[in-house]
């Protein structure tokens, strides 16, 4: 009865407070809603617009129901986007995570299969021969030894299986595109978070702040949930309990703008070849630039404020092929 009351409130256009949404999402993750009820909830939230209370409450419910990940006693970050920008770009965040790890920064990348593009993080990792469903213990070992591990959302959030069929049928952005990046089971307090619309910047930053993030950056890059090589990137930076809003262009990273079309990706297999070329120092200039710019902001979360210098370091580590060694070492974890 309580579930029906909460759903009814949503259908009436009412906002749920954090406690109410946390309760509703507990029921969702436990599989207590029918597909029809769940589709109704997702559509109602989408058309009415999600609020900070709802996002933070839903994240808390999902994390509370997740399989645990070993405690990490050193600084680490995540780089992840909401997806749903329908740009079908190459796998920039995944490549940036490998580059940052090669530079010595600890990265726990949380990812899933694609919902609205051809190749999500898990899709391309599979194509590269990387085991995406490693045990939590082996993933922690990879993080300890290689500065990097990938956590597959479906392995830790078993309740997502109740949601996946409805998301596939709807084939559109839902609150789960918004929630996913904030639900890393390692519970990072430092994240580079890409969002598919500038309208999400403020609400996403406020949600991250409410969830206890120490230093995170939310970005929207002229239509992308990545730093833009083709124009302006809007930024909301959470640091020391405050949110600062500003914008960046490729010039701030030491580059000139490039056409977005140069970042078009393909299937997981095609994107895996592009990613491999990048890490071997054989990538296209535009691809190198995109990865370097995103890596530069990721490095900022570790206290490296000079993003132009950060981007140059990222370019150099790709050029010398050391990042490809990191990829090969990661393949050994089975």
From Swiss-Prot:
It is an enzyme of class 2 (transferase). Anthranilate 2 binds at residue 167. GO terms for molecular function: anthranilate phosphoribosyltransferase activity; magnesium ion binding. Its EC number is 2.4.2.18. One of its GO terms (cellular component) is cytosol. It catalyses: N-(5-phospho-beta-D-ribosyl)anthranilate + diphosphate = 5-phospho-alpha-D-ribose 1-diphosphate + anthranilate. Binds 2 magnesium ions per monomer. Its cofactor is Mg(2+). Mg(2+) 1 binds at residues 93, 226. GO terms for biological process: L-tryptophan biosynthetic process. InterPro entries: Anthranilate_Pribosyl_Tfrase (IPR005940), Glycosyl_Trfase_fam3 (IPR000312), Glycosyl_Trfase_fam3_N_dom (IPR017459), Glycosyl_Trfase_fam3_N_dom_sf (IPR036320), Nuc_phospho_transferase (IPR035902). Anthranilate 1 binds at residues 81, 112. Keywords: Amino-acid biosynthesis, Aromatic amino acid biosynthesis, Glycosyltransferase, Magnesium, Metal-binding, Transferase, Tryptophan biosynthesis. 5-phospho-alpha-D-ribose 1-diphosphate binds at residues 81, 84-85, 89, 91-94, 109-117, 121. Mg(2+) 2 binds at residues 225-226. Pathway: Amino-acid biosynthesis; L-tryptophan biosynthesis; L-tryptophan from chorismate: step 2/5. It comes from the Bacteria. Belongs to the anthranilate phosphoribosyltransferase family. Catalyzes the transfer of the phosphoribosyl group of 5-phosphorylribose-1-pyrophosphate (PRPP) to anthranilate to yield N-(5'-phosphoribosyl)-anthranilate (PRA). PANTHER family: ANTHRANILATE PHOSPHORIBOSYLTRANSFERASE. HAMAP family: TrpD. Homodimer. This is Anthranilate phosphoribosyltransferase. The gene is trpD.
